[in-house]
């Protein structure tokens, strides 16, 4: 029995040769047809290296690239492509394949889908295919509005005024949430759920820069 092709956003079967259902593409990218990512894995590695050396990469241990959406017309008549921009620009963050740790994008997106199933609020994310066929992990930036305007967000490394993002505790983060959150009880509950889920899924990367408070329109 032949396995059907799956949507890279929702994992349900596809009836076309595209990588996304139209509804899934509209939900994540804002277009009925998903934009193209016209880079090979070798080009991605070279871009990542150049950006890291230029000190304009998105912070983090795992290589990340900031992507902007360009609404132009492609050769096949479809509109839209994603292009690499500086760390301060773009509405998406891309994590390409890592030769040292194979299939990290697939693992991260699967974990995010599991979190959704458990009712945990997550940043919108998907897999996306490179021109050379490899899958990368892509997520929306939640510190940017659709028009590119910045949304104020601070991570716990900044909030707790720490000197080392790895030298702290979950208790210290919880106390900071209690002090600075405008919805303390709900945010503490969310934090507790994330801790339990991270323990179950083996996520041991819960350092201070992976927890943030974001200002919403009501604050």
Predicted ranges, named:
Residues 35-39, 81-86, 182-183:
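Short hydrophobic/aromatic-rich motifs at helix boundaries and adjacent loops
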Residues 43-164:
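Conserved ATP-binding subdomain of kinase catalytic cores across diverse folds
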Residues 26-28, 53, 86-87, 92, ...:
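Broad hydrophobic/π-residue packing in well-ordered secondary structure
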Residues 99-116, 169-219:
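Conserved kinase catalytic-core segment
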């Amino acid at each position: 029995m032949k396995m059907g092709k799956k949507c890279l956003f929702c994992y349900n079967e596809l009836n076309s040769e595209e990588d996304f259902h139209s509804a899934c593409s509209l939900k994540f990218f804002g277009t009925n047809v998903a934009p193209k990512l016209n880079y090979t894995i070798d080009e991605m590695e070279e871009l990542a290296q150049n950006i890291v050396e230029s000190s304009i990469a998105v912070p983090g241990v795992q290589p990340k690239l900031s992507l902007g959406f360009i609404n132009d017309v492609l050769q096949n008549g479809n509109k839209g492509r994603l292009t690499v921009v500086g760390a301060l620009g773009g509405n998406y963050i891309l994590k390409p394949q890592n030769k040292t740790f194979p299939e990290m994008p697939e693992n991260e997106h699967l974990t995010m889908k599991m979190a959704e199933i458990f009712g945990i609020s997550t940043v919108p994310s998907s897999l996306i295919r490179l021109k050379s066929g490899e899958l990368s992990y892509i997520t929306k930036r939640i510190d940017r509005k659709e028009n590119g305007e910045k949304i104020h967000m601070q991570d716990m490394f900044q909030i707790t005024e720490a000197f080392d993002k790895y030298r702290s505790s979950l208790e210290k983060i919880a106390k900071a949430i209690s002090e600075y959150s405008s919805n303390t009880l709900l945010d503490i509950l969310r934090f507790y759920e994330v801790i339990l889920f991270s323990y179950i899924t083996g996520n041991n990367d819960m350092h201070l820069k992976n927890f943030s408070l974001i200002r919403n329109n009501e604050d």
